[in-house]
Amino acid sequence: MEKWARIKYTPNLPLGENGERVTASQKHIELSCEAACEGMVLLKNDRNVLPIRKGTRVALFGKGVFDYVKGGGGSGDVTVPYIRNLYEGLSQYTSDISIYDKSVRFYQEYVADQYRLGIAPGMIKEPALPEDILADAAAYADTAIIAISRFSGEGWDRKVAGVDREIKCEAKDLVEQGNKIFDHGDFYLTNAEKKMVKMVKENFSSVIVVMNVGGVVDTTWFKKDDQISSVLMAWQGGIEGGLAAARILLGKVNPSGKLSDTFAARLEDYPSTEGFHEDDDYVDYTEDIYVGYRYFETIPGAKEKVNYPFGYGLSYTTFLLEDYKAEPFVASAADEVGKSDSDLADAIVASVTVTNIGKIPGKEVVQLYYSAPQGKLGKPAKVLGGYAKTRLLQPGESQRVTIALYMEDMASYDDLGKVKKAAWLLEKGEYHFFLGTSVRDTRLLDYTYELSKNIIVEQVSNKLVPTSLPKRMLADGTYEELPQTEPVDTYATIFPRPKNWKETIEHDVLKTPVVRPQDRFQLFLPPKEGDPKKFIEVAECKVTLEDFIAQLSNEQLASLLGGQPNVGMANTFGYGNLPEVGVPNAQTCDGPAGVRIAPEVGVVTTAFPCSTLLACTWNEDICYEVGVAGGEEAKECNFGAWLTPAVNIHRSPLCGRNFEYYSEDPFLAGKQAAAMVRGIQSNNIIATPKHFALNNKESNRKGSDSRASERAIREIYLKAFEIIVKEQSPGASCLQYNIVNGQRSSESHDLLTGILRDEWGFEGVVVSDWWGFGEHYKEVLAGNDIKMGCGYTEQLLEAIDKKALKRKDLEKRQSESSRCFSNSTKLKAA
């Protein structure tokens, strides 16, 4: 055993220097701003209008100037000491620019009035722009800045035009508000926004747009419009997002963000759009592995539908890439590293020299893509295989960038047996490699990796096989039919399913276990003969984990397999809570953008940028630093586990929680999130990647079936989780609510045991999402260790009586939880 995970209660003592708190400290807030600057993406900069020259007079337009959205709603929300909007950010630099005041006062008063009415940030209607203010502003300045903001959140998906039926969701008030505001869906500008933009364009020679959004939106309205000079994709930048945007607009920081998603010309251009709201009870992933750029770069006719490609982003300076090289690198003999074939080399190493040939210091992102032979399985035209961001290069400075790509990471999964059933394999043929600065801006390298025969990288077994998915897309844009089978309930149903889940869940919220207090001095008293074995003795190797668990009664074991009540600052419940044997009540906290504490507690924390922005940094170091800072805040506020990062795939722009997630690409999402996990766990705080898996829709999220092929599940939707598990050994994994191919994920032995534990070697604790619809005893059998926010002790005991469960099943689940708490999972430190 290396270290304890931080689960034992200690007072809320400051962890900073000189007795100061680190939570919401200036250091952490500055880090949040730095991260926001690093991930904002400059999409357009005609005539080099940006950065704004010193002495420029500017006029601000759009309710988004004050209606700033720091992040999305639900678990991703954070209670903060303040929020700095775009106007407040620009106001920090009044020595550099002059801001027209009448439009400022107009929008400030309007937004304040709307907030007083209880309308959420980002859900405010664009007001009509008074013509007298516009005329006066045009006389004052020739540069205009327009701010557009959007909001979405947990429990509901983004508005889309043309869907007239009522959609099952949990945030009907926000959906109704969206229906009032967004004429064409929130992907597009509203009529009021279009009118405001038109008025501004007609009166100013230089128009700059700042997009304060959490996900993909329409870009056609400005891409081909010569009257709009520059566009900054500012995303949702956390507590200091307005200041970060201001620093980029004024050239205090040179933008270096790159898109983590493809921006198509229309919402309808994404293959997922057509069926997203087709039915509340299921979603067919018929596009299969062709998600994001894999679709647009591969499928015939799709390339021209792209406005801004994956990996794209401008800078205020210019970089020259030269001296491209690629060569094989064999770290060890194939049999020594467990490869199945001696012909399989370890890696290709690609390198290029990046030189800043402009006049401004800046950073560039080098991206390595590969192209596998189509073979019998069919492949995307390009797949991201590696990336690296340069340091800040001064004008004239160069850096040699080297990226390694392991050959086994190019393997495809054969689910139907076209080559070898249920195998990860490399098909024979030529593998090509590309280096560049976006998926479109690449150079073909002069090294080709050629296989004369198919190579099996890993033989597994079929899991999560689809039962109702009728077809899937192929690389040529056609579809193949898939075999249909009946969903199988792995475990016998011994309890009737509730007819009204809503009432059941509401009852369970009130039924959470009571705190079982124990005199804290007893924790430090030496054990006496006859005393029960204590958990601390397991950590000290005085008692085996098996002996410790063996002494527990069935009732105690069953209790430990459910969530425990909130104490201290918590509002997402805890794990453990068996003080008579020294098992503490380890508290958890949300969420992906910072430690979330309920406003009524009175403790504020740092809101970091949304995960989409963090992905756009293409910088693992900044994600690690955010993880360290967030872990410190969790530690100082006495939490043992932080329910982050969220790494579901941006399958569709319509998903309401895309702001919590990183990218359309699983490799980028996995690497960025793995760095964050490493940072979190350097504090001995348990990181909890979620939502495992295929949580790509919020509407009817507890009843919707995600129907996907096994290949798509493994190559796209599980891959980010796999990277995190294998590289950083997270202490926990949080499941999702939805159904996957006819079976609830929390009841899926294939997912929780077959893939997560047996194939990937996961050793942490698996927890359900809070008050899901899975049956507790089935979850225990499948491999779910703790049912959150509370368990069903009586049901587990009855299941034992009815022979549906055995005591050893409870013991197995508790042994996994105990290993996590005592940190035998070896939480990795920096």
Curated annotation (Swiss-Prot):
Reaction(s) the record says it catalyses: Hydrolysis of terminal, non-reducing beta-D-glucosyl residues with release of beta-D-glucose
InterPro entries with a match to the protein in the record: Cellulose_deg_GH3, Fn3-like, Glyco_hydro_3_AS, Glyco_hydro_3_C, Glyco_hydro_3_C_sf, Glyco_hydro_3_N, Glyco_hydro_3_N_sf, Glycoside_hydrolase_SF
Pfam families (alphabetical): Fn3-like, Glyco_hydro_3, Glyco_hydro_3_C
Catalytic residues (positions): D769
Family: Belongs to the glycosyl hydrolase 3 family.
Species the sequence originates in: Butyrivibrio fibrisolvens
Single GO MF annotation: beta-glucosidase activity
E.C. designation(s): 3.2.1.21
Protein name: Beta-glucosidase A
Gene Ontology biological process terms in this record: cellulose catabolic process
Enzyme class, spelled out: hydrolase
Keywords from the UniProt entry: Carbohydrate metabolism, Cellulose degradation, Glycosidase, Hydrolase, Polysaccharide degradation
PANTHER family: BETA-GLUCOSIDASE
Function: B.fibrisolvens beta-glucosidase hydrolyzes cellobiose to a limited extent, cellotriose to cellobiose and glucose, and cellotetraose and cellopentaose to predominantly glucose.
